[in-house]
Swiss-Prot record:
One of its GO terms (molecular function) is glutamate N-acetyltransferase activity. This is Arginine biosynthesis bifunctional protein ArgJ, mitochondrial. The keyword Mitochondrion applies. The active site is at T224. GO terms for cellular component: mitochondrial matrix. It comes from Aspergillus clavatus (strain ATCC 1007 / CBS 513.65 / DSM 816 / NCTC 3887 / NRRL 1 / QM 1276 / 107). It catalyses: N(2)-acetyl-L-ornithine + L-glutamate = N-acetyl-L-glutamate + L-ornithine; L-glutamate + acetyl-CoA = N-acetyl-L-glutamate + CoA + H(+). Its EC number is 2.3.1.35, 2.3.1.1.
Length: 454
């Protein structure tokens, strides 16, 4: 772990977070020193040099199961879907979510808007991994991230895939290096793992591991954000897809850095059943309910690391919309607040300008009729230290705000904004609630993205 210990000042945004770790001191706490990884999964991170300026850092990730997996994925809604997205979609459809063995990912080039040639490049990446596995049917999902509109140096990648396959390992260091290999403007690799049990198999201990990348162009459905989750629990493909869809809607699709949606987003989950036990195949089972809670909570923790690494970000903000007639309306309001440049810049400037929050609530499109009524809307700042909330607006009436306390709350790295649509503790509309996580906008964000291609 010594390689991950060097501290630097400011927001360092090399194209990929280097292994000799130019990681801000405040971010080092997010790098795990150990992990509990699922049985039967092997991983590797290999240097290819996809981006010409990358002369030594790993930029090719390979995740492989020793046995066939159930697999599911959620993809970007951007109309310009990248070649690897198209290829992975086709593979999952043809295999009906069964028999998937690997995921191969390159960073440094998105392979998006690259025509037929780019599509063939993505196909050939998957084929090369399948050849290494000795498989004749497409069994590999493909992901790419980086600059849009440029072709991959496909010969270099194909030449290095056998090396990546030969270097597959199950150690914590291998998982960490693999998580690092998918980074672009991230300042740290994002990796989590945990163990769990299921009601029907209390004697079996299962593991769940996940890695993700993303720091900018983040406002899913989904954004320039990749993620792979692996578990050794036995889950049928149909159950796995619905579990992932639910988890992603409340995690990776509930975060925002800058409001942009990319061409490449993919979150995939692989389940190989290597830890044994009864398979999860029914949405009505106790195991399914438990797995839904476990996967959603895990995905939320993983996705929040993306927000904490937002380009130029200085704050991690939770917005909680309560007492809505339905979840979708609450989520739309939370999303609108999270992507408001005026809200984000006010938070960066430590300005308790709650009028900007109220404005975002008011112009939210698509909410159910009667959801937003000014006379019963309340807005508060909730400090993370457990102290009393700072009420800004109560039932449509402005409070006398203690500006000194507001400034003190906004100086903290973490902050929660609470929007109550019911106008009281219990509310008049019901108990539906949605949560979104986002970061502020700073001068650094402009600098980072102005220099992106260099």
């Amino acid at each position: 772990m010594a390689a991950f210990a060097r501290m630097v000042k400011g927001q360092v945004r090399n194209y990929s977070a280097p292994l000799d770790m130019a990681i801000p001191a405040s971010k080092q706490k997010y790098i795990p020193s150990s992990g509990s990884y699922p049985k039967g999964f092997l991983v590797s991170g290999t240097h290819v040099g996809v981006k010409a300026s990358n002369t030594r850092f790993p930029d090719l990730a390979l995740i492989s199961s020793e046995t066939p997996c159930s697999a599911a994925a959620v993809f970007t809604t951007n109309k310009f879907q990248a070649a690897p997205v198209q290829v992975s979609k086709k593979t999952l459809q043809e295999r009906q979510g069964q028999g998937i063995r690997s995921v191969v990912i390159n960073s440094g080039c998105a392979n998006a808007v690259t025509g037929k040639g780019g599509y063939e490049d993505a196909v050939n990446m998957g084929k090369k991994v399948d050849e290494c596995e000795g498989l004749s049917k497409p069994s590999t999902l493909v992901m790419s991230t980086g600059v849009i509109g440029q072709r991959l140096p496909i010969s270099k990648i194909l030449d290095k895939i056998p090396t990546a396959y030969a270097n597959l390992a199950s150690t914590h260091e291998a998982w960490l290096t693999t998580a690092r290999a998918i980074c672009t403007t991230d300042t740290f690799p994002k990796l989590l793992s945990r163990t769990f049990t299921l009601p029907s198999s209390p004697g079996h201990t299962y593991s769940l591991a996940g890695m993700t990348k993303g720091a900018g162009m983040i406002h899913p459905n989904m954004a320039t954000l990749l993620g792979v989750l692996c578990t050794d629990a036995p889950i049928a493909p149909s159950a796995l897809q619905s579990l992932l869809k639910y988890a992603v809607s409340r995690s990776f699709n509930s975060i925002s850095v800058d409001g942009d949606t990319s061409t490449n987003d993919t979150i995939a989950v692989l389940a190989n059943g290597a830890a044994g036990g009864a398979p999860i195949n029914s949405a009505s089972s106790d195991d399914y309910a438990a797995m839904q809670e476990i996967l959603t909570s895990f995905a939320q923790s993983l996705s929040q690391l993306v927000v904490r690494d937002g380009e130029g970000a200085t704050k991690f903000v939770t917005v909680r919309v309560q007492n809505s007639p339905d979840y979708d309306s609450a989520r739309l309001i939370a999303s609108t607040i999270a992507r408001s440049p005026l809200v984000k810049t006010a938070l960066y400037g430590r300005d308790a300008n709650w009028g900007r929050i109220l404005c975002a609530i008011g112009y939210t499109q698509g909410v159910a009729p009667g959801t937003v009524v000014p006379e019963r809307t309340s807005v508060s700042f909730k400090p993370v230290d457990g102290s009393a909330v700072l009420k800004l607006l109560v039932n449509g009436e402005p409070e006398q705000v203690d500006e000194e306390r507001a400034s003190a709350i906004l100086q903290e790295e973490d902050l929660e904004i609470v929007v109550d649509l019911g106008g009281g503790e219990k509310g008049e509309l019901g108990g539906e609630e949605a949560v979104y996580w986002f970061c502020d906008f700073s001068h650094e964000y402009v600098t980072i993205n102005g220099d992106y291609r260099t």
